[in-house]
Amino acid sequence: MFVSYRWLQEYVDIKDVTAQELADKITKSGIEVEGVEVLNKGVKGVVVGHVLECEKHPEADKLSKCLIDIGEEEPVQIICGAANIAKGLKVPVAKVGAVLPGNFKIKKAKLRGEASHGMVCALQELGIDGKLVSKEYADGIFIFPSDAEVGADALEILNLHDEVLELGLTPNRADCLNMLGVAYEVAAIYGREVKLPAIDLQETAEKTADYISVSVEAKEENPLYIAKMVKNVKIGPSPMWMQTRLMAAGIRPISNVVDITNYILMEYGQPLHAFDYDKLGSKEIVVRLAKEGEKIETLDDQERTLQSHHLVITNGTKALAVAGVMGGADSEVTNETVNVLIESAYFAGQTVRRTSKDLGLRSESSARFEKGIDPTRTFEAIQHAAALMAKYAGGEALEGVVEADNLQVQERTVSVTADKVNRVLGTNISASEMGTMFTNLKFPFTEVEGTFHVNVPARRPDITISEDLVEEVGRLYGYDHIPVTLPSGTMTRGKLTSAQTKRRKVRRFLEGAGLYEAITYSLTSTDKAKQYMVEPNEKAPVALALPMSEERSQLRLSLVPQLLEAVSYNVARKNDSVALYEVGSIFLPTEEGELPKEEQHLAGVMTGLALHHAWQGEKKVVDFFVMKGVLEGLFDVLGVSNQITYAPAKREGMHPGRTADIVLDGEVIGFIGQLHPEAEKQLDVKNTFVFELSLVKVFGADAEETYYSAIPRFPSMTRDMAVVVTKETKAGEMKQVIAEAGGELLKDVTLFDLYEGEKMEEGKKSLAFSMNYFDPERTLTDEEVTEAHNRVLTAVEEKFGAELRK
C-alpha cells in the first residue's frame, strides 16, 4: 500500500510530524513501513511555461522552435522535439540551471544552429514512472490546465513535493488498504481526530430507480449491491490533484469518471465500477452465478470462459462484468460515454478469490474483496463518487440509489480485562490509559471493574478475541516501551535425544560416503503409494480428502519411489551419476477412521559411477557391493553391524538375483538391491541400486559398546583362501562358519574376491577370503596358525562342499 504523506494530512493533522518520523512510528506500532520515497527526486528549477510561439525548426523536421514565457522579464527560446508541443499550451519547463533526476543539469545549448535556453519536460523526465503516466502524455510532453499560473513551481502543481510511504501490510490488516484506514491508524498512534471527507452531493429530481432495477440471485455470494445513475457526464481528464494522488498510489490516470472510481477505491477501500448505461442493453441488473462455459470479454480485451461458481453482473441475459474482479468490454466507459451507472457492492471474499485465481486475473478491487472490506462504507462511497462525477465530469446525479440489501452486519463485542493485558504484555498500564487507547482507536467501549467490553467497528474484521485487544494495546503503548526482563526460574541445559544423535550420525556418515540428502514429497499418487514397501501391507494407503492433484493424493508407504523420481529427473538432464539419501516418515494405515502410524525410514539410491576416473585409479561403477559397503559402514557406526545379516529376496520392482532383505535379529527391517530391468526402463535409468530400512528398528537395537585397547605389541599373521562352491552358496553364511571354526585366534575375515568366469565349471563360483590371526599376549607360531587354518578348511568342506581353488 502506497500512502501519500500530503494526501494523508487531509484526514489527520500531522503537519508537525515528518514523513520519516511518521514511518518510524507506524513501524513501531506493528505495521512495517518498507520505505519512504521522495517524489521530487532532487528536481528543482522546473516552472510552468506558456508557449507564445511555436514553429518548425529550420534545419530539422522533428524539432520545433518555441518562444516560451516562464514568468521572467523576457520569454526564452527553447528547442523541443515533442510532437504534441503547440502554441498556447502551458507546459513544464526546466530553466537553465535546473536539476533533473540523476543530477542532470540544464545548460544553454545549440541544437542544429538554434539556441535553446531550457527544456520542455515530459513527466518521465521529472522522475515519474512511465507506467503511471496517462496514455495522453506517454509519448510527449505534459500539458498543464489552462488556468495554471505562468512561472509557478511545476512540482507543486504536480504534487511532487511529497513523500510516499510503502506499507508492508500483513493479510489481517486489510483495513489499511485505503487512506481512511491508514488515517485511523495514524490518529490512534498520535491521539488525534480523523476528518472524514465532506460529501457535497446535489441530486436532481429524477430518480435512479426510474432508470434501473437491481436483483440478486446469488445472495450468499453477494449480500449487498447498490447502483446509482449519473447522467450527462463529459469524459475528459480528471483534475490535476486527483491524477497526482492516483500516481502516488501507483495507479495510472485514465479519465475523470474512471479516475473517480479509483480515487474512491484508494480513499475508502470500497471498489466501485462504472458502466456505460447506454451499453447495458436493458434496464435491469441481475447478479447471478455464471453458466458453465459462459464467455465474457473483460476490460483487458481478453475473452474469459467462466465456470458455474463464478459470480457475474448481467443485464438479465448477458454477462457485463466478473463480480469483484474486472468489468466487461461491452459496457466500458469510453470518450463517447454520456450516462454512467455506478456500482458499489459487497462480494464474498472467498468467491472473488476463487474466481480471480481461476481466471488468472488479479486487480486492486479483487485484492480488497479477498481480504475483506468495510460494508458500512458501501453507500457513503457511491454517494461520494456521484458527487465527484457531478463536480468534475459535469454530470447530474439522480436522486437516490437502487439496492439489493441482504447484508446483516452483526455487532462484535470483545471483552478483555486490564489484568490480562498487563499479564500478557508484562506491563503496568492503568485502566484509564487503556481506555484512552481504545478511544483513540475509535473503539466504543464500556468498562466494568477493570473489564473492557469493546464494540469493534466493521472496518476491523481482524479483532475477534481478547488477545487481539491485547495486541492493540501493545501496539499503541509501543513495543519498544515494554520492559525488558530476562527469563526467570530453573534453567535446564537442553540436549539431543538418542534418536536425534543417531540421525545426525546417519546423515554425517552418508554424506561422507558421497550421498546427497534429498527431501521429497510425503504425498504421492495412487499407483506409486504401495511400491517398494519394506513390509507388505494389505490396507489401502491413507488418502487426502481434498487433494490438490491426483499426483499428490496419497500418503507414502515408502521413500524409494520419490527418490527414483529425483534420479530420473537428474539423469534426463545429463547428470548420470547420482547418489541420494533421505531420512523421512512413511505413513502406515491403521484402523479406518484413525490416524496413520508414522514411522521414520532411511532410503538411498545410487546410479552411474561410484568413483570417477582419476589419476590415482580407474573409475568404479555402482554395483550391489558398493551400496552394501555403504550400509555396512553405516551399521558399524551405529554399533549394530554384528546383528545384521542379509538374505536373498524377491521383491516386486527389484532384480530377482540382485536383491536381499536386511535382517536384524531375525526380523526383516529393510531391503537392498538393483531395480528390475523393466523398472529401470520405465524410469529411463540404468544400473540403479536402492535400499530402504526402518530407522526405528535400527535405533531400537542394542548398540555394541566401543572398547579401546593399546596398539598391539605382537605381529599378526594373514592367510588367504580361495574356494570353489556352488553359485547358491551365500558368502555371508560361509564367512560366519569360517569365523566360528577359526576360534579365538581368528580376529578378522574379509571377502576380497568373487569370480564366475569362463574357467569355472557351470553352476560354480570362486570365493576368496583373507583371514587375520592374532594373539595380543604373544607371537603366534606358524604351526598354531596352520592348525587353526586347517580347521577352517575342514569346516567349509564339510558345510558347503567347498574345494580349494588351484
Swiss-Prot record:
It catalyses: tRNA(Phe) + L-phenylalanine + ATP = L-phenylalanyl-tRNA(Phe) + AMP + diphosphate + H(+). Binds 2 magnesium ions per tetramer. Its EC number is 6.1.1.20. GO terms for biological process: phenylalanyl-tRNA aminoacylation. The keyword Acetylation does not apply. One of its GO terms (cellular component) is phenylalanine-tRNA ligase complex. It is found in: Cytoplasm. Residues 409-484 form the B5 domain. InterPro entries: aa-tRNA-synth_II/BPL/LPL, B3/B4_tRNA-bd, DNA-bd_dom_put_sf, Fdx_antiC-bd, Fdx_antiC-bd_sf, NA-bd_OB-fold, Phe-tRNA-ligase_IIc_bsu, Phe-tRNA-ligase_IIc_bsu_bact. PROSITE patterns: B5 (PS51483), FDX_ACB (PS51447), TRBD (PS50886). Mg(2+) binds at residues 462, 468, 471-472. Keywords: Aminoacyl-tRNA synthetase, ATP-binding, Cytoplasm, Ligase, Magnesium, Metal-binding, Nucleotide-binding, Protein biosynthesis, RNA-binding, tRNA-binding. Belongs to the phenylalanyl-tRNA synthetase beta subunit family. Type 1 subfamily. NCBIfam families: pheT_bact, YtpR. This is Phenylalanine--tRNA ligase beta subunit. The lineage of its organism: Bacteria, Bacillati, Bacillota, Bacilli, Bacillales. The gene is pheT.
